[in-house]
């Protein structure tokens, strides 16, 4: 007797989901009825978020405590999804971190780890699941920043990594469109989250003059929840670049003139 084909469940994979924009994105996708896989290093934070989502009457997300800067991270994620009978309909690449200081003075190993997480891991997951996203007619949301539009003395490697994410994602938007995959790049301005504390913000040099300037003015700042809502809506509408906030949009337009 022929055995029935195994069934799989469609999920949204969210990296960097332990706090900030990543956690907010997870909540937004869950609120719209998507089942989730949450990935970050801090398992306790992921478990707390998963419990909270389940308490809202949604399926409890699968929690994967994985360091995405490690070379085997992509293979581990694919293996875990397969073992649980899950297929990613959407990938949200949010994991990343920044460091404040002159590039020549900061620890080189830490900066290379930043490149591994902000660039290599994002690229690996974007490409590794492209065929699945195409088959499921899903989407890819990569998180960049308004920093991706300008050079950033004082955060040189971080700004450069976000410029890569912006350029790479815009190219994928066109390459994968013919295969039915929506690709959007989310470019928030300053957001008061744990990310800023880790990076040593709020004071960084202003990119064009090198003069100190406070990051997080009321005109540019959005909440993590506002950013997440804009990212979800932009992805579902197939927008190439999503910049939350009128002031932030103005900044990005000016830099491209």
Residue ranges with predicted function:
Residues 94-99:
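Conserved NAD(P)H cofactor-binding loop of Rossmann-fold oxidoreductase domains
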Residues 18-19:
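Conserved glycine-rich cofactor-binding loop
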Residues 32-49:
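Conserved glycine-rich Rossmann-like NAD(P)H-binding loop of the short-chain dehydrogenase/reductase
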């Amino acid at each position: 007797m022929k055995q029935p084909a195994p069934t799989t469940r469609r999920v949204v994979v969210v990296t960097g989901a332990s706090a900030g924009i990543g956690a907010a994105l997870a909540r937004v996708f869950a609120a719209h009825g998507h089942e989730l896989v949450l990935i970050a290093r801090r398992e306790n934070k992921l478990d707390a978020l998963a419990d909270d989502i389940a308490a809202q009457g949604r399926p409890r997300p699968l929690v994967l405590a994985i360091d995405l800067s490690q070379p085997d991270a992509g293979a581990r994620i694919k293996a875990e999804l397969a073992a649980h009978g899950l297929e990613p309909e959407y990938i949200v690449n949010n994991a990343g971190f920044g460091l404040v200081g002159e590039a020549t003075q900061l620890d080189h190993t830490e900066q290379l780890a930043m490149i591994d997480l902000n660039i290599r891991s994002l690229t690996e997951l974007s490409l590794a699941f492209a065929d699945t996203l195409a088959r499921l007619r899903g989407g890819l949301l990569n998180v960049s920043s308004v920093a991706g539009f300008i050079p950033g003395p004082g955060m040189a490697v971080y700004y450069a990594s976000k410029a890569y994410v912006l350029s790479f994602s815009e190219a994928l938007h066109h390459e994968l469109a013919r295969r039915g995959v929506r690709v959007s790049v989310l470019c928030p301005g300053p957001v008061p989250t744990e990310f800023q504390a880790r990076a040593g913000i709020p004071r960084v040099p202003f990119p064009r003059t090198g003069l100190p300037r406070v990051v997080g003015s009321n005109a540019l700042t959005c909440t993590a929840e506002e950013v997440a809502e804009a990212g979800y809506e932009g992805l579902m509408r197939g927008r190439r670049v999503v910049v939350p906030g009128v002031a932030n949009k103005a900044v990005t337009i000016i830099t491209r003139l």
